[in-house]
Amino acid sequence: MYRLIFEKRELDNLNKLQKQIKERIWKKLQDCKENPLKFFERLVGDKSFKLRVGDWRIIAEIDVSEQIIKILKVGHRKNIYG
């Protein structure tokens, strides 16, 4: 099973979201821990991956050899890619 590692700022951003949104994102991340490549999509021209949770996006790096999902960004889809 993969481990989740958050950038400190992104963990703070996640905790600032409304409870319902935060729980939905957290549940999706827990589901991804078994096989993240099933849920995450690779970003074009980048080594990062994205996960869609409704209108919210999670940008992460996935290290298969170490079995780590490193969360780089959490945000609304209109703001996340800028």
Model-based region annotation:
Residues 27-52:
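A short, surface-exposed loop/turn module that caps and links secondary-structure elements
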Residues 1-23, 53-56, 61-82:
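Enriched for short, Lys/Arg-rich terminal
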